[in-house]
Every structure is written in C-alpha cells, then in structure tokens.
A protein has these predicted regions:
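Terminal alpha-helical segments
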Residues: 1-140
Length: 140
C-alpha cells in the first residue's frame, strides 16, 4: 500500500468507530464498547505510522518491527511513549476484556492526538498531502 491508501484506512477506522459508537448508544441499555473505542484509536495510530514508513520506503509488516522503528528513528522518539500507552490500553481491552471510563478514554484520545499530530506533520513534510487529522473525540 502507498501512504495515501494507508491514510484512507485511517479514515475508514474513524468511520467504523462512529458507526460502532452510534449503534452501541442506540441499544437499551447502551452497550459498553469502550474496549473497541481504545482498540480503534490504537489501530489508527498504527496506520499513521505505517503511512509514514511507506513514505520513507519502509514496509512495516508487524508490531515488533513497527515498535523497533519507532524506538530507533530520531524524529519519532517523541511519540514512542504515547504510542506504547495506546498499544497497552488496546492490548488490555482485547486480551483482558477491560472496559474504560470517560477519563481513561480521554487519556487514550490524548495519546492518540499526540501521535497523530506528530505524524501528520512529518507526512506533510514528506509531501503526503492527503494526511487527515482525524479526531475520535466526538465518538468517545
């Protein structure tokens, strides 16, 4: 995939989050899908990283290589901590069945926004103009 295709996937993940949140809120009683909200935020962050990697002719095929690249690339070091926190929260949701309250969702959104803002700036500097600055906030 090229960077623009990855960025369309980010938008798709946001659209999926919106659909999920709307469907869950429409249930009686409302369904708690906070686990998937965190997971989708992590997936969007991951796809932003993959888009940047592709713009630099790198093909990251798994989370291990992605983390290794984040931890060893000078202009990405600023986002290693928020990215890792998002990944851990997503892992807790997927493998431990954790659900999250509003404060925890807000923290996850904050981490996501740090990653997104940094990567969108780098993508634009690399000439990728289709970098959407998606915000999951309205769907949390």
């Amino acid at each position: 995939m090229n960077p623009e295709q990855y960025l369309r996937l980010v938008q798709h993940d946001l659209d999926t989050l919106a659909l999920l949140a709307k469907a869950a809120a429409g249930r009686t009683p409302p369904e708690d899908v906070s686990d998937w909200k965190c997971t989708l935020m992590f997936y969007m962050a991951c796809v932003y990283v993959k888009a940047l990697a592709r713009s630099r002719q790198k093909d990251l095929q798994d989370h291990y290589n992605l983390r290794q690249w984040l931890n060893t690339t000078k202009d990405l070091l600023a986002i290693t901590k928020p990215y890792r926190r998002l990944e851990e929260r997503s892992r807790d949701a997927r493998y431990e069945g954790r659900r999250f309250g509003g404060q925890e969702l807000g923290e996850a959104r904050s981490w996501f926004l740090q990653v997104r803002d940094h990567l969108v700036q780098l993508l634009e500097a690399a000439g990728v103009r289709a970098a959407p600055g998606v915000d999951p906030g309205p769907h949390l």
